[in-house]
């Protein structure tokens, strides 16, 4: 299989061996350095493959250094492709380019076959192509068939646009040249045969004339012998007359027959030679006619080649013209687009001119009203300042009103509690006055009732009564704390309202600053923003303090409420026990005397309530009230500051540059965060 595949390579190698080259070119290793191929190309087309180009091919690459061989082969293949494209106008787009690296490293036969195909194409298409074609025709028929197949593959790899006409012309030209060579050889052979037959004919004609002369001589001798009576032989002996039946007659007859046979044979050979000469003349005439036809076909092929060259040039010019036509079409489309854009721009410019005229008229109109607008702006600013002052006064008055309302509510609650206590005391006094006992009996009754009770219960009762008084007084303080808490909550709400108004004002100022010129932004609103930031910090500090104080007060209130409920439950339990004991004492006293018992009970209760009322009530100190109010104000200020800081961070953080954000003051940390740290 490998031999069948490489059959074309060996055929091309046999043809390459016929070239007269200085470098060795007998095998694949000698061809792998590229020197022999370069010499062959220089021999084929010295005007393209010049001596200076041949000098660049290094002959020292025959050794082990395959990189030098690869560089030589690269130069050879590149020059071959340039020759095909520039000189022969071949486009070898479908032909696989030989891999020079595989040739240099491994002496690959397939790649060498492709390289030798390109070299064969150069030899067939060069100026001395007739001599190389005749050398190819002198090879064996198998080699000629393989070489013809290699040329057909090379021709089939040409460009598709040139494929149909050029391949047929090239094949017909090659086949015509090969047939012409065969006919020339046949004509030479026939001419040689004709020359030999003519020589034979001349020899036979000479021999015929000699035989005729000999025959005439023999006939003359025979006639002489017939007329003479005696015949003398060579030895001088008389042979006697020639008579039929004699020995001499028989011998002469035999010689005559032999001569006749030879004459007939010579005449037959002459006729055969004449026929052969005529046949060869007819063949020679047919060959001459065929040669004339082939010469005409070669002339037609050359004319067709010239026409193909003209068509190729016209095709190239047509391609160039088509490219120019495409560019002109694109330019025309761009020109049309530019025309449309120019029309649109003209329309826009006309609209802009009209708008500018209208704007100029409007500017003339508004120039008169500009002074009035500035006056109105100043008046509006004054009115805004007055409105701000009035709103702040209104807020203060609302805050004072709310404080007074809180105090009024606290006083109303205290009044209601006092009225309830008064009603309860009246009921108890009425019950006590029903006894009508004297003070002495009352004293004895009380002493008796106290004597009847154990001392532990008496002490416990006294302690519970004191705690009850303290809790009642603490309840009054608790109401005061609740009032303070309400006041603090109201103040916090007022501060939140002020914070809301301040935030709205900040938003309006920021909106105005965004809509106005950025140069006026820093000059007009910088001071106002700084003032608002300072006010915001103060308010937030106050709000934080008030929040912390309100939370602490709320915790205290809840603790006091829980303690109060627990104490009330204990008081209720002890009161029930006390009433049971008191009823038992009353029953005991009634068992002694019912009148004394009622008097003792009423007098004892009156004294007990007098003692309870005379005890001093604990009051809240002034310092505690001041601390509560200051804590409440701090709480409100801190809350306001936190709210303003958050809104300012939202407003100033978006839509500003890095430098503008760096100029702003960072918001202060809350008091609670500082305390936690």
From Swiss-Prot:
It is found in: Cytoplasm, Cytoskeleton; Endosome; Synapse. Keywords: Coiled coil, Cytoplasm, Cytoskeleton, Developmental protein, Endocytosis, Endosome, Microtubule, Synapse. One of its GO terms (molecular function) is dynein light intermediate chain binding. Residues 135-436, 478-588 form a coiled coil. Transmembrane segments: none annotated. GO terms for biological process: cytoplasmic microtubule organization; cytoskeleton-dependent intracellular transport; determination of adult lifespan; endocytosis. Its main location: cytoplasm. SUPFAM superfamilies: Hook domain. One of its GO terms (cellular component) is endosome. Residues 6-123 form the Calponin-homology (CH) domain. The keyword Coiled coil applies. It holds the Pfam family HOOK_N. Involved in endocytic trafficking by stabilizing organelles of the endocytic pathway. Probably acts as a cytoskeletal linker protein required to tether endosome vesicles to the cytoskeleton. Involved in modulation of endocytosis at stages required for down-regulation of membrane proteins that control synapse size. Not involved in synaptic vesicle recycling. Required in R7 cells for boss endocytosis into multivesicular bodies (MVBs). Has a role in regulating adult longevity. The coiled coil domain mediates homodimerization. Belongs to the hook family. Homodimer. Interacts with microtubules via its N-terminus. This is Protein hook.
């Amino acid at each position: 299989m490998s031999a069948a595949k490489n059959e074309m390579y060996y055929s091309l190698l046999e043809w390459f061996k016929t070239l007269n080259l200085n470098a060795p070119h007998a095998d694949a290793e000698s061809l792998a350095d590229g020197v022999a191929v370069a010499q062959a190309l220089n021999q084929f087309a010295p005007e393209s493959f010049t001596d200076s180009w041949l000098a660049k091919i290094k002959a020292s690459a025959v050794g082990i250094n395959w990189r030098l061989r690869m560089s030589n082969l690269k130069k050879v293949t590149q020059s071959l492709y340039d020759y095909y494209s520039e000189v022969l106008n071949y486009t070898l787009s479908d032909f696989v380019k030989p891999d020079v690296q595989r040739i240099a490293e491994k002496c690959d036969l397939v790649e060498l076959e492709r390289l030798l195909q390109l070299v064969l194409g150069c030899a067939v298409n060069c100026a001395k192509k007739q001599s190389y074609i005749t050398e190819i025709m002198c090879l064996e028929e198998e080699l000629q068939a393989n070489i013809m197949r290699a040329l057909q593959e090379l021709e089939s790899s040409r460009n598709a646009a040139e494929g149909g006409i050029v391949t047929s012309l090239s094949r017909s030209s090659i086949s015509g040249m090969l047939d012409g060579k065969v006919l020339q050889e046949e004509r030479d052979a026939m001419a040689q045969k004709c020359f030999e037959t003519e020589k034979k004919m001349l020899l036979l004609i000479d021999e015929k004339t000699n035989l005729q002369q000999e025959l005439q001589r023999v006939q003359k001798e025979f006639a002489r012998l017939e007329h003479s009576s005696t015949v003398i032989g060579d030895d001088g002996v008389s042979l006697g007359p020639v008579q039929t039946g004699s020995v001499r007659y028989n011998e002469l007859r035999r010689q005559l027959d032999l001569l006749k046979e030879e004459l007939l044979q010579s005449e037959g050979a002459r006729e055969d030679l004449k026929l052969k000469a005529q046949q060869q003349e007819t063949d020679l005439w047919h060959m001459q006619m065929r040669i004339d036809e082939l010469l005409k076909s070669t002339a037609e092929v050359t004319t067709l080649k010239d026409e193909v060259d003209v068509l190729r040039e016209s095709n190239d010019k047509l391609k160039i013209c088509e490219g120019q036509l495409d560019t002109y079409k694109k330019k025309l489309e761009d020109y049309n687009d530019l025309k449309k854009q120019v029309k649109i721009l003209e329309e826009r410019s006309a609209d802009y001119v009209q708008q500018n005229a209208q704007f100029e008229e409007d500017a003339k109109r508004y120039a008169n009203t500009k002074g009035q607008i500035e006056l109105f702006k100043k008046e509006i600013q004054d009115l805004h300042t007055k409105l701000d002052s009035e709103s702040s006064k209104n807020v203060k008055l609302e805050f004072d009103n709310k404080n007074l309302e809180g105090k009024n509510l606290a006083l109303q609650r205290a009044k209601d509690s006092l009225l309830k206590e008064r009603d309860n005391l009246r009921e108890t006094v009425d019950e006590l006055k029903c006894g009508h006992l004297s003070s002495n009996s009352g004293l004895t009754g009380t002493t008796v009732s106290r004597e009847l009770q154990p001392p532990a219960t008496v002490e416990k009762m006294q302690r519970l009564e004191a705690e009850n008084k303290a809790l009642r007084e603490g309840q009054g303080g608790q109401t005061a704390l609740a009032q303070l808490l309400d006041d603090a909550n109201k103040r916090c709400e007022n501060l939140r309202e002020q914070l809301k108004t301040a935030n709205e004002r900040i938003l309006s100022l920021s909106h105005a600053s965004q809509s106005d010129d950025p140069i006026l932004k820093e000059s007009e609103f910088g001071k106002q923003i700084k003032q608002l930031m300072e006010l915001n910090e103060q308010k937030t500090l106050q709000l934080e303090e008030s929040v912390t104080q309100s939370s602490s007060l709320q915790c205290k209130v809840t603790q006091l409420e829980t303690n109060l409920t627990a104490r009330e439950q204990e008081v209720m339990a002890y009161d029930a026990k006390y009433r049971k004991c008191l009823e038992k004492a009353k029953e005991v006293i009634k068992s002694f005397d019912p009148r004394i018992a009622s008097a003792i009970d009423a007098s004892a209760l009156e004294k007990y309530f007098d003692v309870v009322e005379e005890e001093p009530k604990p009051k809240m100190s002034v310092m505690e009230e001041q601390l509560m109010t200051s804590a409440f104000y701090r709480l409100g200020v801190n809350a306001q500051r936190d709210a303003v800081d958050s809104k300012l961070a939202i407003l100033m953080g978006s839509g500003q540059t890095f430098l503008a954000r760096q100029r702003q003051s960072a918001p202060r940390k809350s008091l609670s965060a500082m305390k936690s740290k």
